[in-house]
Amino acid sequence: MVNTILVPVAVAIVSVLVGGCAGYSIRKNKWETQAQNAAHDAKHILADAESKAKAVEADLASQKEAMKKAAADAKKEKILEAQEEIHHYRERVDNELNERRQEVSRQENRLLQREDAIDHKDSLLDQKDSQLTQKENQIKKLQAQVLEKENRADQLVTEREKKLYEVAELNQEDAKKIVLDKLSDQLVKERAEMIEESNQLAKAKADHFARKVIVDAIQSSAADTVSEKTVSVVNLPSDDMKGRIIGREGRNIRSFEALTGVDVIIDDTPDVVVLSGFDPIRREIAKRALERLIKDGRIHPARIEEMVDRARKEVNDDIYEAGESALMELGIHKMHPELVKILGRLKYRTSYGQNVLSHSIEVGKLTGVMAAELGLDEKIAVRAGLLHDIGKSIDHEIEGSHVEIGVELARKYHEPDLVVNAIAAHHDDVPKLSFIAELVVAADTISSARPGARSESLENYIRRLEQLETIAKGHIGVKQAYAIQAGREIRVMVEPDKISDARTTILAHDIRNQIEQDMEYPGNIKVTVIREKRAVAIAK
């Protein structure tokens, strides 16, 4: 029973063992096969990974090389840009340095010119000082000579007294009287000579100082010149605008002329309209109004009236601003507003081609500089110089001369008495009550009589020169006469056999008087009479 049971059990165990061994062997073979396959796959994967790694390394190397090249190119480009920028900067610096060198050179030249001018003036002053010193030394020598002569005269008196006692047997009183009379006559003559020489020396000093004051005043001022005219020209965009300016049946041009008080001249001149009138303020108002009408394009009586009113207001504002600018330029304060406005009107007033406002400003500057040199009231002097021709602003509207009108305006607006007298006396109509009035006359003469300050038409100019020469030639003994200095001087050549030296002075005064009676002219005319006698002998 037991054996029966054990046999199957043993068989089962053996079967299990044999099956386990066989299964193990089969599994082992399978595992080895899988291991070989895995090793083979691993080799392939490793080979692929190595090839990919090499490719990546090569790619990285190429990228690195490209980056190095790009960096080098960028660096090179930046270096080029930097070099170019440095080049441009260097050029700018060189240009600035050249400009500064040129400016420094110009300033050095100006300084050298000023130094030369100053040295020239110093040399002139030194010469004048040396001349004055020589004159003083001469006077001292003359005084010493006079003293010596007085001592000699005393000796002569004593000697002559003795001789008179011996020869004429005169008493002492009679002899003394004779000697003293002769000595007195001699001393009077010598004293007169000394006084004359002292007067000439004093006059030379005064002339030198006066010239210095006037030259300093002239150098401190400069004024523009203008040309006198009675017409204004307005440019048109086209000739078609002329018909619109005239208007239907001429109503536009009649309205414009009635409102402005000027004549509108429309002729064949292309693209131009001429405004004619003696009053420059009206002409300026008309010009501005017409220019605005042309620009606006709407031209009819109502629009014309509006534009004329606007232009009149603008011109009045400009007039007041011109007066204020003149006061600011000269440093004048506290003037009546109405007088400022009247002063500004001089901007549109000319006299012999010279703008009266510019002339008045120049006279104010000159008067102020000369007053300062002489220690006078500079502010009053400047004020008097500026207002000396104030009457010319309205002399065509009010009856009377510009001097009378100016005096009336100055009194009306409470100007100082010195200013009123300077205005009244600047043409010698009334006596001058102060040195400031004299300075105003001098400054007015400098400003108006200097060459180029005033002008006149060519026909009047030639006629005036011919009249000057005719007047001079009409006198007996005159050989030839020449008008020079733009008619501001007439030089008269006389026949020495008919006119003596003493007679030349009388002839100059006669010609001057006839010029003053027969001619009208700006400024002054100098009459110079020249008498020359030549003696010729030929040696053979």
Swiss-Prot record:
Q: What GO terms describe the biological role, i.e. biological process, of this protein?
A: mRNA catabolic process
Q: What is the recorded membrane topology of this protein? A: Single-pass membrane protein
Residue ranges of the KH domain? 230-293
Annotated Gene Ontology MF terms?
A: RNA binding; RNA endonuclease activity
Task: Assign the protein's first listed, main location to one coarse class.
Answer: membrane
Q: Which residues cross the membrane?
A: 4-24
- Residues forming the HD domain are 356-449
Task: Specify the enzyme's EC class, one word.
Answer: hydrolase
UniProt keyword Membrane, yes or no: yes
Cellular component, GO annotation = plasma membrane
At the top level, the lineage of the source is Bacteria
Q: Which UniProt keywords apply?
A: Cell membrane, Endonuclease, Hydrolase, Membrane, Nuclease, RNA-binding, Transmembrane, Transmembrane helix
Under Enzyme Commission nomenclature, its number is 3.1.-.-
Location(s) in or outside the cell: Cell membrane
Query: Which family is annotated?
Result: Belongs to the RNase Y family.
Job of this protein: Endoribonuclease that initiates mRNA decay.
Protein name stated in the entry = Ribonuclease Y
Gene symbol here is: rny
